[in-house]
């Protein structure tokens, strides 16, 4: 996280930006769940805060990541849960139509619903949730693994080369496009190891047009070496808000 913050600061000096989103593993750390943290980064944790405080070991990691800590406050203020750039929505696992419907009673338009999602997660990270409604939606956004924008696997499991009008795409992707008036969805979360190990891919195509959904978790981490030892570096390039291109490095 520190690295990406540094990259954003450097990019900003040249008219660019590096936008970072929150994912389920950042939230797990804030919940005190370190199941997927390596032994080294848990037991030998070592962090010097900008204010001069030193945090070490497992207890140090717990204190650094607890809601309301200085580190998590920075995380809350520098990262969103969902981001729309142009006509493309970016989020970790995907905002499902069923989640949008659960926000209907708030009487918010589609953009305000996304702002509300960002606000509730941010308030939780800042340790500033207040009232029953905040707690209710915090549980929905963060803990409900079936529909949470950090946890659901719906978008990640749709097969390649699936039409936008198929049941799988229509009931999740197309309805989300309609509700939020967007053109494309980009998600991570579910490693794309089932697509002939091709990594980043798109699906939910519309006749005469490109794919409406892109999945960009190619299983690039070393933890997936057992499944794909020859994985390559990939990026999804988006130009002029309409041209999507998957760039893949040459295999060794």
Swiss-Prot record:
It is a single-pass membrane protein. It is found in: Host membrane; Virion. Its main location: host cell. GO terms for cellular component: host cell membrane; membrane; virion component. Keywords: Host membrane, Membrane, Transmembrane, Transmembrane helix, Virion. It comes from the Viruses. Disulfide bonds: none annotated. The chain crosses the membrane at residues 80-100. This is Uncharacterized protein R398. It comes from Acanthamoeba polyphaga mimivirus.
């Amino acid at each position: 996280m520190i690295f990406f913050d540094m990259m954003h600061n450097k990019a900003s000096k040249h008219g660019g930006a590096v936008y970072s989103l929150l994912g389920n593993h950042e939230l797990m750390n804030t919940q005190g769940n370190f199941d997927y943290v390596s032994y080294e980064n848990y037991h030998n944790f070592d962090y010097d805060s900008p204010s001069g405080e030193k945090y070490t070991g497992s207890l140090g990691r717990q204190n650094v990541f607890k809601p309301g800590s200085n580190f998590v406050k920075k995380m809350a203020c520098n990262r969103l849960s969902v981001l729309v750039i142009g006509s493309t929505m970016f989020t970790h696992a995907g905002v499902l139509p069923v989640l949008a419907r659960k926000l209907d009673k708030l009487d918010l338009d589609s953009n305000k619903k996304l702002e509300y999602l960002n606000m509730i997660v941010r308030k939780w990270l800042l340790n500033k949730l207040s009232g029953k409604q905040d707690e209710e939606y915090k549980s929905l956004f963060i803990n409900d693994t079936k529909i949470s924008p950090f946890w659901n696997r719906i978008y990640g499991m749709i097969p390649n080369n699936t039409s936008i009008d198929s049941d799988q795409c229509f009931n999740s992707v197309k309805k989300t496009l309609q509700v939020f008036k967007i053109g494309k969805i980009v998600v991570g979360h579910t490693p794309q190891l089932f697509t002939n190990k091709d990594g980043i891919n798109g699906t939910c195509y519309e006749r005469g047009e490109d794919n409406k959904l892109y999945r960009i978790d190619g299983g690039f981490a070393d933890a997936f070496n057992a499944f794909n030892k020859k994985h390559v570096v990939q990026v999804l390039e988006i130009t002029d808000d309409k041209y999507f291109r998957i760039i893949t490095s040459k295999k060794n």
